[in-house]
Each structure stands twice: as structure tokens, then as C-alpha cells.
Regions:
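Core subunits and conserved enzymes of cellular information-processing
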Residues: 2-230
Length: 230
């Protein structure tokens, strides 16, 4: 069936979906901030950013952005779609985490209970952020595209368990870089996969089933919409 969407409707649709994705990504950044402030060892991805920022004169957020664009290259090789959501993810999570860190609202935890609770809250929040921004179907972020791409190669394995293996591999690199590794880091490797399965299961969400729009599809839709007028 021919697309009759006008260009103004196309813009409103993509802007609305982009705004929805941005909200989800800021929720994700908040979860990353919680994990840092848990002071219990970070998630492997955060630990990787921290390790790079420790070895080079760049901020945590900048390191996060650099890593994101490197992974985008890997995603392209895996033929995962790269779209508006991918670019937003690469920029907003790192920048958003820096914003929350600069605000300093949540103090670093010093007790075992405090560390554990804040870490678990951070993991749950990041899962919710993943769900929200991925539902916009504007393509996954670099890390999530990598996760989904690997998950498609093992369709019978729950995505959380695929994530667990991926995080374990990232943690090996973190160890080499001298990133801080604590009990919380180990909990993140195994806990993130488990919590992902629980949260996504509760929301009845399967990221591998989503049909994402890549940049070529977005441009094609824009071109078609222009033909239909404003």
C-alpha cells in the first residue's frame, strides 16, 4: 500500500518518537548514575568507561561516547540497523550521566546495604530505560545493537543470558585496564542478565522482535513524504 504520509506528519512522527527515545535514554543515564553512586563496583560498561578515563585525560561521559562510536562500527559489520536512536544513545547516555554526576544529588554509599540497594535500583532503572527507548523503534544504541545482534545468533537463549556473557567479556577488558572491580561488578555481570529477563518478561518485551528503522529507511520515508506535500 502506498505511503500517503505528508512531510509534516513524517516530521511530527519522528520528532515524537525521538522525544520518547530521549526520555528513555535519560532514564538509562539515571540508572548508570545510580550504579556509579552505589560505590560497589560498576557495571562492566561503566567500568570500561571509568578505566579509559583513568588512563587518559577525558571525562567518564566522553569515554562513554568514544566507546559507543567504536561499537557502532562493530554493529555495522554485524549488519544491525543504525538509526536516529543509535546516535541519540551514543551521545545522551554519556552526557546525561555527566549531568547527574555534576548535580551530586545522590551521595556515594558507604554501607553494604546502601551499596546493594542503590546498585540494584540502578540496574532496574537502566532496564526500564532500555525498554522505553527501544520501543521507539528508531534503532538500538551501540551496546544494545551488539547485544541484539548476538542474541539473534542464539534465538533460543533469553536475551538476559546473552547479556551476561557479553558483560563478562567486557569485564575482562576492564580488568586489563585496571578499572575498579568490586563485589558489585560481579553482581552486575550476573545480576543484570537476571534482572533483564525479569523486567523484560514482566513487560512482555522481546527486543529481538522489534522492527527498527535505520537511517536509510528514515531517509526513504522522508523522500516519499516530500512527494506527498507538506
Amino acid at each position: 500500500m502506498k505511503n500517503t504520509e505528508t512531510f509534516s506528519k513524517f516530521l511530527l512522527n519522528r520528532l515524537g518518537r525521538s522525544a520518547f527515545a530521549i526520555v528513555g535514554l535519560m532514564v538509562f543515564a539515571l540508572g548508570s548514575y545510580f550504579q556509579i553512586q552505589a560505590n560497589f563496583g560498576m557495571s562492566p560498561w561503566n567500568s570500561l568507561s571509568q578505566g579509559i578515563s583513568m588512563n587518559y585525560p577525558i571525562t567518564f561521559g566522553t569515554a562513554n561516547i568514544i566507546i559507543s562510536f567504536i561499537i557502532i562500527g562493530i554493529d555495522i559489520l554485524m549488519r544491525e540497523p543504525i538509526g536516529i536512536g543509535t546516535i541519540l544513545n551514543a551521545i545522551i547516555i554519556g552526557a546525561g550521566t555527566d549531568v547527574f554526576l555534576s548535580m551530586g544529588v545522590l551521595p556515594q554509599q558507604t554501607t553494604f546495604i546502601g551499596k546493594f540497594v542503590v546498585l540494584m535500583a540502578g540496574i532496574v532503572i537502566t532496564c526500564l530505560g532500555q525498554y522505553l527507548y527501544m520501543k521507539a523503534c528508531l534503532s538500538c544504541g551501540p551496546r544494545d545493537s551488539l547485544l541484539v545482534g548476538l542474541g539473534k545468533k542464539f534465538p533460543k537463549v533469553k536475551i538476559g543470558y546473552v547479556n551476561m556473557v557479553l558483560l563478562a567479556m567486557v569485564q575482562v577488558v576492564c580488568f586489563i585496564l585496571g578499572s575498579p572491580v568490586g563485589l558489585g561488578t560481579v553482581i552486575c555481570v550476573f545480576g543484570t542478565g537476571t534482572i533483564t529477563n525479569i523486567v523484560f518478561g514482566f513487560l512482555k518485551f522481546e527486543p529481538r522482535a522489534l522492527k527498527h528503522e535505520g537511517i536509510p529507511e528514515t531517509l526513504a520515508a522522508a523522500k516519499e513524504a516530500l512527494k506527498n506535500g507538506f
